[in-house]
Amino acid sequence: MPSDIEIARAATLKPIAQVAEKLGIPDEALHNYGKHIAKIDHDFIASLEGKPEGKLVLVTAISPTPAGEGKTTTTVGLGDALNRIGKRAVMCLREPSLGPCFGMKGGAAGGGKAQVVPMEQINLHFTGDFHAITSAHSLAAALIDNHIYWANELNIDVRRIHWRRVVDMNDRALRAINQSLGGVANGFPREDGFDITVASEVMAVFCLAKNLADLEERLGRIVIAETRDRKPVTLADVKATGAMTVLLKDALQPNLVQTLEGNPALIHGGPFANIAHGCNSVIATRTGLRLADYTVTEAGFGADLGAEKFIDIKCRQTGLKPSAVVIVATIRALKMHGGVNKKDLQAENLDALEKGFANLERHVNNVRSFGLPVVVGVNHFFQDTDAEHARLKELCRDRLQVEAITCKHWAEGGAGAEALAQAVVKLAEGEQKPLTFAYETETKITDKIKAIATKLYGAADIQIESKAATKLAGFEKDGYGGLPVCMAKTQYSFSTDPTLMGAPSGHLVSVRDVRLSAGAGFVVVICGEIMTMPGLPKVPAADTIRLDANGQIDGLF
């Protein structure tokens, strides 16, 4: 089969106005970026306020493995399949970060015959949203140092500035730096560092804001430093929010593109799935719901991280509620969770599959604990055997009373996911229960952490290190105790040990640090080592990306 980029390049794309017509978006509401990309105007989005909303479908997954699950591919394939069976459907996805495109991951726009296009533009610069977010974040950093340089009227303690700088690139050399060197004219020297743009709180705020006014208000709440007497200093205090909002004004308009089958997709925002909530923008999701029968969206990593945050943070803040949840699994990944080495995954192994099923089982039960109906989408790989698929369906039916559906959208496009689409419609249009959360926000922050660890991760208890405990007490004292929590831990395990696969139980979840994201509206709980500025691997994807003799991009996935 051709590579993803070869498939994408061979596709005949529709003019973006034709794609917009499927959602009833008029030409005058589009700001075109070439022939196949457009932003949807703020005024048109505001005019949709009060319209009835369609069904929301959340796509999540088992705990990821190096074998791959194909969550974005399934999201795209399901959206295409829903359109094929007569439902007006739109997909809502996160924008890919530039850094990982040149690092380990390569491009991120689905795969095979279930892709969003134009692939090259989506992966490289797109409409400039991430550049706008980087610029807004950098402006805030400049204003903070400028305030300190010119008399420091807010009495900011230069030892307690929390606002690091950002760049949308994997660059380990920037993780820790010394700034303002070279003399008095350059400001006050201090230690600083860079994160990747998707780790910026501006990105999280961008993706949770309801509109421009809400964006500016949330930016103003971001705590960027402390005073000498340990009082919080916000971006509003340094008068940064107006100019930052101006930089973000156009970026906040959702981006409209299409799938290989010409169906609409909204790709907008892209926060980290560990130190942030890992979902596309609220504005894009709401826009999709008001224009389509079905809006299919995904949440980052496995259901223990992505789906939990989608519900406990995004749904809690916005009132959204999924009508159905798809948990993506693969035979390969379940065998890895059952102890099989990656190099041995091609061999049939029903025993390992059954052992690894414990991971899927816990994810299904966790999602059901929120009151949501679930179906399992089994992403088919050509090495899978019929016996393995039959055994997985049997396990799902007998032990979970849930349907598992084999999907072949990677090879067949939407036609390969029609059975999954029919199952999703049946769930979404069936009986719905009230949405429940893993915890109530009125409880103490430590109780919220414990609720997630014990209810969803299978942990016996939590262990909070002294530095984190001191900071939590400060958050409670400063009035932030009512915020939800955003767990930052390894995506590869229910525990904080990435090598502990399957469904471990009885472990301790150790809390190393906590961070306040007051603008986004949550407390980040850091369990283990979390990297906010990735590095490049020994052989980065950038090594093989080039322009060919015809000026076409080669090597991008």
UniProtKB/Swiss-Prot annotation:
Gene Ontology process terms (BP): tetrahydrofolate interconversion
Alphabetized InterPro entries for the sequence: Formate_THF_ligase, Formate_THF_ligase_CS, P-loop_NTPase
Binding site for ATP: T65, P66, A67, G68, E69, G70, K71, T72
Entry EC number(s): 6.3.4.3
Transcription regulation is among the record's keywords: no
Pathway: One-carbon metabolism; tetrahydrofolate interconversion
Assigned keywords, A-Z: ATP-binding, Ligase, Nucleotide-binding, One-carbon metabolism
A matching Pfam family: FTHFS
Substrates-to-products reaction catalysed: (6S)-5,6,7,8-tetrahydrofolate + formate + ATP = (6R)-10-formyltetrahydrofolate + ADP + phosphate
Origin superkingdom: Bacteria
GO MF, one example: formate-tetrahydrofolate ligase activity
Family: Belongs to the formate--tetrahydrofolate ligase family.
Quaternary structure and partners: Homotetramer.
NCBIfam families assigned: PRK13505.1
Protein name: Formate--tetrahydrofolate ligase
Upper classification of the organism: Bacteria, Pseudomonadati, Pseudomonadota, Alphaproteobacteria, Hyphomicrobiales
